[in-house]
Amino acid sequence: MGELSGIPLVLAHPRFLVVQKPAGLLSQPGLGAHQQDSLITRLQRECKGLRLVHRLDRDTSGLVVVARDQDSLRDLSALFAARRVQKLYLADVVGTVGKHQGCQDQPLARLERHPPRYGPHPDGKPCRTLWRQHARMPGLTRLWLRPLTG
C-alpha cells in the first residue's frame, strides 16, 4: 500500500490509518532527548493531526491504529477500552511448551523501573491471556497469544 515517513502503511481509512511499527522504535516519544524518535513523531512529519490510538512496546513489532482526528481518536479509544478490538500476538518462547494450548491467568505488576519490566506479582493487576502453539523449533516454541485483560 505504500509508506508514510518510511513506516509501512497497511490500511488507509478516512478516519484512521493502520501502520506496521518496526521492533526497536518507540510508539511515542520518551522523556529523554535520546528518546524523541518514535512512530508518531515520524508519522506526524507528513500528517500533523495524527494521534496514537494504542501503543506497542519498543521491542514489539506489529500493527498500530492511528486516528486522523480527535473525534476518531475518541471513538476508536472507546472500542479498545470496551475490549471490542481483539489483539493477537505471535511470540517466540525459549524452551518447549508441553501443552498445545492454555490460559495464563496471573496478576502482573512492574518489577523494575529502568528499563520497565513487568511480571507475575500477587499484588498486580489481573492479567488473563489465551495461548496456542503455532510451531516448535529446536529449543523454541512459537505461540499465538490473545490477551483478554491486562
Regions found by a protein language model. Give the residues of each.
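RNA pseudouridine synthases
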Residues: 1-150
